[in-house]
Curated annotation (Swiss-Prot):
Full protein name: Sterol 3-beta-glucosyltransferase
Function: Sterol glycosyltransferase responsible for the glycosylation of ergosterol to form ergosterol-glucoside.
Chief localization: cytoplasm
Matches recorded under PROSITE patterns: PH_DOMAIN
Catalytic reaction list: a sterol + UDP-alpha-D-glucose = a sterol 3-beta-D-glucoside + UDP + H(+); ergosterol + UDP-alpha-D-glucose = ergosteryl 3-beta-D-glucoside + UDP + H(+)
Length: 1374
């Protein structure tokens, strides 16, 4: 069998990509690079290397990741600080059940293909596939049908004589459902034999009787005049499938009440009472999340998990910061009810969720929380039962028994309508309607209408019975056939009005006698009314048969899947009733499956036709024999292998006696590894290796099993699978699943149950690397806001194939517009429901009756309102009532000061009094913007020189800093203390080192703000410790721990001496400072550095704090002419500027830049600042003449300059990177020290630029060409620029200040109470000269101690307090 065209093309692309030679970078080229950009002789040379002798012997700078943290890199992947290995918290009960399909591996469990439409009016194709595809589908279908031997060809009726039989040959075949259902999105299936007998009986009945077309509302509309009916009447006739338009007497805006509050409209017509509610839904929004305790299946102990209710799935996690690895889930698509569990004390904290397989027990922290969870779960279960985006209820007025007022709340009037279901069973349904206005008028009007109709209906029934009694037998028989196959019965009293549930098929299929799936629903109201004698709180969740789908359809080719139809039948009937079906009686009596609401005369008719049916169908015994043959077929394939194993292993022969060969095949295939790709129908493609063609014919359950494993919707189609190791604490062997929108993993080792569900929209990039073990090949998945994931494959072909497949899916997902609605395949249904709702609104407003009821839900609404839920708290304005004196403390270069100027300008606009404390050289710049200034000592150029010449925190850096910076740090601390006096709030860059202690002494709230990651996380490494290769979350986290300890050890002595002498505070330690508790404001974009999932609530990534100075800047004439000339020549324009750096050969670097620009054929704006020593005046002068393609400038505002160019190449500083990304241009980064390596890696991970490890003509020229010609990179950079420009970082930061201000005040009070002395600027009443026991309680109150026991805490804190008191006492008497 040949694969589909798109699959063949995908396979060809994959093979080509896999065969490409690996480049020096993991970044794939989107465009074919010209041959002139191949690596030359200088490819391994770096012209930005510092002078020989500076930092190391070989002249290369030893950055931080190459010195101190090299030992961390060796063991980083073996460390674990957050229990990354998901083990079961309760060994005897928490194991989630395996999908039922795995219990019957060897049986005929292949997924049934969709049932073709049998209505000749409906086309059977979706979009116009090619002839090859149609023929292939037909061959596949016929081959599967011939193997099954359980199918009947429907004979053509007279009504279908005009249809070409040959063209619909495959469409006339129907498959019997599988023996065991798979846990897919389809509803629960009825017992297999019951369904099979019912289907056979229905087929025989329809084949022995002439075809009677159902009443088509659309056709009836064309045959009758429409002038007498209003637009609203016509619309209601279509939506509720009335036989003719009915005049709308009155309408009301009301709500249908059960466990939900469904806002909609009630329409009272001449013959019916109708209710319509439009319910748009969104599946990508978390409805509710929080901590709950879950009880194991066998273990009565409760275990605490983090729960998230999203879409149709309730998932729970051991760690809320690791949401891609759920510990388990509850699939609410199979949910029956959610209810509180009553307790004797009356405080119901426990609740349970019942599904078709088991009952889950939960315990909340409070009774209120339990009620909120139950309401949220009931909402989701309700939506899963109502498959459409609208709810429709309709019943004849003649069936209404009575109305009764039922007051439930003071703000609404509620009454109950009791309706009889049918004349045979007299089952009664109750509907509660709540009116916020005109409730009494509605009650009186409907009650009077019911009383007026009751007499007329009784007279009409007597006349109808008299007419039927005198009808000829043939006429009566035709009437009975009509009652079985039609949607409605002509008798109004017995009318099974349009009270079916919503479905995904059109109206024609619902009314068709050939669609047997809908026939089973006819008896559901009666059966459920007989079994459920009392109305439960969640009956609306179970009684889903009253709902209907939108009747206005845009999908012409959607056909009903057999599994969906059978599941629909099962949900709409009582499970106990279907379980009681006797096989012998069912086989012997075809009428046993017609429904309980059929009269005895119906049974006699069906029995009388049995002789005619007997000649046209095989016996039931023959069919059952064929069924047994189909089930045994997999065992026949395994006969030879089973005999071989049987002679050698008695245990294996016992296994084979009970299990099919599929188990052995799966286990052997699992350890062999490899990959499989799946086509449109989720069968493996024959071009894949180790794929049996016979497996392809019966493999349509691959996708069902995949969706059942991970509780995914039916629209998530399986595309490829791979066997690989997931590296967490230990390599975990399992299976990778790739679908349209998700990357999933499931462990296959017994005793483990790790599962991963990773949406493609959260994946930033995929890179190929070496494996951790010899002979294995690694694949790194870079995730937005999460640590990297490492996979290992035993074959490079599988790794390359997986990488190419992931890149293809990432590209398709990134360019899709996220609508926030359901899956793409369901958008047509959503649009149909929207259109139906919109047309009904227009008809209602344009109706001449003058309906003026207010609108209810809009199309943008996404929630079902819980009934009488507690109102949400209003949004509180956290802005302080009085203006604050805010000081911003920072040191460093111009890029460190500029963000604070932008923030202070925003604070000025808010009415506050900001001040910036920094180096004196920036005072004129700061005061120009109307911001107060305070000087801080220290020469930033000297610090920059040490960093550039020695690398960040290398051994030589620490040695020189300890010799030259002792006095520098003392002056910095003292001047910062003076500059922060009189402040109400302090915001500090942590590099200033003094702010946290000053805020503690002044007892004022303290915030931190910085341009690079400084808070511990597993998602990113410390900005000063970026490794050359990705090391994983353990390494990332430990870099912060090591940096904090090294940084504190270097300054602890001076800081504690300064605290004692000038601040009057006790000496402190790293633990006591609790830096990880300080609220933090990061001034970079969340689109560039996504907030890690393990960040606490007080860590905010606000967006860039841009200072827009380019609007007032006038460019020189030479620069304007150069830009205009480049545009007129059609040349790409780039900016190159690496700042003030020290290189060994400045002229060689200049020559490299010139040759790279000429080779890339671009025009360049150059900002030169490199030299062989820092501060050299000749750094801005060029050593060699510049060609006319390059223009050198001294300075220009980045916001103006970057908007004029096509690409930017710079050193990767935080401010410069933010400016180039904001302009939406591709960015080339050549990092030198500090945080530049971190932002360079982020640029490359986002696909918006290139990070170069070395700079030479070969690498730089190719990077310039790709940045200016790669459409993939250009589009990504443009989209990222749009996102950044839409952010308002300053406003977000100010709102975060207001929100966390009270939290910061609390921290300040706790710390000041613990560390104050009589010499503090703000002494406390508890402080005593000898540091008595009064302080110990406060110390224990705020000190972070981790997981230590209470005894260890008290002992350790008392020892620390005594030591601190002795130290202070000795200092006082010295």
């Amino acid at each position: 069998m040949r694969p589909l065209r798109d699959d063949a093309k995908r396979r060809a692309d994959r093979q080509l990509s896999a065969s490409m030679k690996p480049t020096s970078s993991n970044r794939p080229f989107s465009d074919r690079v010209p041959d002139r950009f191949k690596d030359g002789d200088d490819a391994q040379f770096d012209f930005t290397a510092p002078p020989r002798g500076m930092g190391s012997r070989d002249g290369n700078v030893h950055y931080m990741q190459q010195s101190l943290f090299s030992m961390i890199a060796a063991v980083g992947s073996k460390s674990d600080f957050h229990a990354r290995f998901d083990e079961s918290s309760d060994s005897d009960g928490e194991m989630e059940e395996q999908p039922r399909v795995e219990q019957t591996t060897g049986k005929a469990s292949s997924r049934t293909p969709p049932v073709p439409s049998l209505d000749p009016r409906q086309p059977s194709k979706r979009s116009e596939p090619s002839k090859l595809v149609l023929e292939e589908r037909g061959r596949r279908h016929q081959r599967a049908c011939s193997d099954n031997k359980l199918l009947q060809r429907l004979p053509k009726s007279d009504a279908e004589g005009g249809v070409n039989e040959s063209s619909n040959q495959s469409d006339s075949l129907l498959k019997v459902p599988p023996l065991r259902r798979t846990r897919s999105a389809t509803p629960r299936a009825a017992p297999v034999l019951s369904r099979m007998v019912e289907a056979q009986s229905h087929f025989d009945l329809t084949s022995a009787t002439p075809y009677l077309p159902p009443n088509n509302p659309d056709k009836s509309m064309e045959d009758q005049p429409q002038s007498s009916a209003s637009a609203l009447s016509m619309r209601l006739m279509k939506m509720f499938e009335f036989a003719k338009p009915e005049k709308v007497l009155v309408e009301y805006a009301c709500s249908l009440l059960q466990s939900m509050l469904l806002q909609g409209y009630m329409y009272v017509t001449e013959g019916h009472i109708c209710f319509y509610a439009y319910l748009p839904k969104k599946s990508n929004v978390a409805i509710k999340s929080g901590y709950l305790s879950k009880r194991g299946r066998k273990n009565p102990k409760y275990h605490r998990y983090w729960f998230a209710l999203k879409g149709d799935v309730l998932s729970y996690y051991a760690d809320p910061s690791n949401l891609y690895f759920p510990s388990g889930h509850v699939d609410l698509r199979y949910g029956i009810s959610a209810s509180l569990t009553e307790r004797k004390d009356g405080d119901a904290k426990d609740f349970q969720v019942t599904t078709d397989q088991r009952t889950y027990l939960f315990r909340a922290d409070s009774a209120t929380s339990a009620k909120e969870w139950v309401k949220a779960l009931q909402q989701v279960i309700f939506r899963t039962h109502n498959e459409g985006d609208s709810v429709k209820v309709s019943f004849p007025i003649a069936n209404v028994i009575d109305l009764e007022e039922s007051p439930m709340a003071d703000f609404a009037e509620t009454f109950k309508i009791r309706v009889i279901d049918s004349g045979e069973t007299y089952a009664i349904d109750e509907y509660f309607f709540s009116f916020f206005d005109s409730g009494q008028d509605a009650f009186n009007y409907i009650k009077g209408l019911v009383n007026a109709v009751s007499t007329t209906t009784a007279t009409k029934e007597a006349q109808d019975q008299h007419d039927i009694k005198h009808q000829p037998e043939s006429s009566r028989t035709a009437y009975k056939r009509q009652s079985v196959s039609s949607v409605r019965v002509s008798d109004q009293r017995r009318e099974d009005s349009p009270r079916k549930r919503s479905s995904s098929v059109g109206n024609e299929n619902q009314g068709s006698a050939d669609s047997f799936a809908e026939q089973g629903t006819g008896s559901s109201p009666i059966i459920q009314s007989m079994t459920d004698t009392t109305e439960s709180a969640s009956q609306i969740l179970h009684r889903s048969d009253v709902f209907q789908a939108p009747t206005m359809r845009t999908l012409q080719g959607r056909s009903l899947d057999v599994g969906e139809s059978i599941r629909r039948y099962s949900d709409d009937t009582t499970p106990s009733a279907s379980a009681r079906l006797d096989l012998d009686a069912a086989v012997g009596s075809p009428c046993g499956t017609l429904g309980h609401n059929e009269t005895t005369e119906d049974a006699r008719y069906a029995t009388g036709q049995s002789d005619l049916m007997q000649s046209s169908r095989p016996s039931s015994v023959t069919q059952l024999n064929e069924l047994v043959k189909a089930g045994v077929y997999p065992l026949q394939r395994a006969a030879g292998f089973a005999e071989y194993l049987k002679s050698r292993s008695k245990q294996m022969s016992t296994l084979l006696a009970t299990e099919s060969m599929g188990y052995i095949e799966k286990v052997s295939g699992m350890w062999i590894g490899g990959q499989k790709h799946y086509g449109e129908r989720e069968g493996p493609l024959l071009e894949d290796q180790n794929v049996d063609p016979e497996d392809n014919e019966g493999s349509f359950n691959y996708g069902d099993r995949f969706r059942a494993h991970f509780a995914l919707p039916p629209t998530e189609k399986l595309q490829a699978t791979y066997y690989a190791y997931l590296h967490r604490v230990l390599p975990l062997y399992g299976k990778i699943y790739i679908s349209q929108k998700k990357l999933c993993f499931r462990s296959l080792i017994p005793g483990t149950r790790t599962k991963m569900i990773l949406p493609f929209k959260d994946i930033e990039n995929v890179e190929k690397e070496k494996g951790f073990r010899f002979g294995y090949h690694g694949l790194v998945v870079i995730i937005r806001g999460h640590e990297e994931l490492f996979f290992e494959f035993n074959a490079s072909d599988s790794r390359d194939d997986c990488a190419v497949t992931l890149h293809q899916n990432l590209e398709s997902v990134k360019f899709l517009v996220e609508s926030g609605l359901l899956a793409e395949d369901e958008r047509d249904e959503v649009e149909a429901a929207k259109a139906e709702h919109r047309m009904l609104e227009e008809a209602r407003l344009d109706s001449p009756e003058g309906h003026d009821a207010p609108p209810t839900l809009t199309e943008d609404s996404s929630e079902i309102h819980p009934f009488f839920d507690d109102p949400r708290a209003s949004i509180i304005n956290f802005k302080p009532p009085e203006p604050l004196r805010i000081t911003c403390l920072t040191i460093g270069s111009r890029g460190d000061v500029q963000p604070y100027i932008a923030l202070c300008k925003g604070l000025l606009a808010e009415g506050h009094k900001p001040k910036i404390a920094t180096h004196a050289e920036f005072e004129p710049w700061i005061r120009k913007h109307g911001i107060d200034f305070a000087p801080v000592d220290g020469d930033p150029a000297e610090l920059m020189r040490i960093c550039v010449e020695n690398g960040m925190f290398t051994y030589s850096f620490l040695r020189e800093a300890s010799l030259k910076f002792r006095g520098w740090i003392d002056d910095l601390l003292s001047s910062a203390w003076i500059g922060c006096q009189g402040s109400d709030l302090l915001i500090e860059s942590p590099s200033a080192m003094a702010g946290i202690h000053i805020a503690e002494a002044l007892r004022i709230p303290y915030f931190r703000g910085f341009t690079m990651p400084w808070t511990r996380t597993r998602a990113y490494p410390h900005a000063f410790a970026v490794p050359e290769n990705r090391m994983g979350g353990a390494y990332n986290y430990i870099t912060y721990v090591m940096f904090d300890n090294i940084f504190w050890k270097a300054i602890a002595g001076q800081v504690n001496r300064w605290r004692n002498n000038e601040l009057g505070l006790k000496a402190t330690t790293l633990d006591k400072m609790q830096q990880n508790k300080v609220p933090f404001l990061y001034n970079y974009s969340p689109s560039v550095v996504a907030p890690p999932l393990d960040y606490p609530d007080w860590i905010r990534i606000t967006g860039y704090w841009f200072l827009n100075e380019g609007t007032d800047w006038t460019p020189p004439t030479e620069l304007s002419n150069f830009i205009a000339q480049a545009r007129s020549d059609g040349k790409k324009l780039v900016y190159i500027g690496f700042g003030s750096i020290v290189v060994s050969d400045p002229s060689a670097l200049t020559r490299t830049v010139i040759e790279s620009v000429l080779k890339a054929d671009v025009r360049c704006i150059l900002s030169k600042g490199w030299s062989d020593r820092l501060g050299d005046p000749a750094s801005t002068k060029t050593e060699i003449p510049l060609p006319p393609e390059i223009l050198q400038i001294q300075s220009a505002p980045h916001d103006w300059l970057f908007s004029q160019i096509d690409a930017a190449a710079h050193h990767g500083g935080a401010g410069t990177t933010g400016a180039s990304l904001r302009a939406g241009v591709p960015t080339i980064v050549k990092p030198f020290f500090g945080d530049q390596f971190f932002f360079g890696s982020r640029v490359e991970d986002l696909g918006v630029g290139i990070c170069m490890k070395k700079l030479n003509v070969s690498v730089f020229s190719r990077a310039l060409w790709e940045a200016t010609h790669s459409e993939r990179m250009i589009v990504k950079a443009r989209n990222l620029g749009i996102q950044i420009r839409n952010e308002d970082g300053v406003a977000t930061a100010i709102q975060a200040l207001y929100r966390d201000l009270e939290y910061a005040k609390t921290l300040a009070r706790q710390k000041s109470l613990a560390s104050s002395t009589p010499f503090s600027p703000t002494p406390t009443a508890k402080a005593s000269p000898d540091g008595g026991d009064d302080d110990l309680d406060d110390i224990e109150e705020w000190t972070f101690v981790g997981d230590e026991t209470g005894f260890d805490i008290a002992k350790r804190m008392r020892e620390r307090a005594a030591s601190d008191a002795d130290r202070i006492g000795s200092n006082m008497f010295q």
